[in-house]
């Protein structure tokens, strides 16, 4: 599940990158349906993630910083569980 951390995604976007984002959020424990559509539930999950890890900018847009933080946290979890 690779997603380009230089892109950004927001409500209304669709496609494989959104599926990857939803999968990553799900791996981190957020209740998101992997549909490939950046819907309201996905936006709420992104906002919740941002609220926890980047409280200075909670906008529901999966930007480069949000995606990089999510990748980094999942890498840490993977190395801890290995």
Feature map (PLM): residue ranges:
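Cell-envelope/ECM-targeting effectors and their regulatory/trafficking segments
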Residues: 1-82
């Amino acid at each position: 599940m690779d997603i380009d951390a230089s892109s950004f995604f927001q409500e209304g976007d669709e496609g494989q990158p959104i599926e990857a984002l939803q999968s990553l959020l799900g791996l981190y424990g957020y209740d998101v349906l992997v549909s490939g559509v950046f819907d309201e539930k996905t936006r709420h999950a992104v906002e919740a993630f941002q609220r926890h890890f980047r409280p200075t900018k909670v906008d529901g847009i999966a930007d480069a910083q949000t995606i990089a933080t999510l990748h980094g946290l999942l890498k840490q979890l993977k190395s801890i569980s290995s």
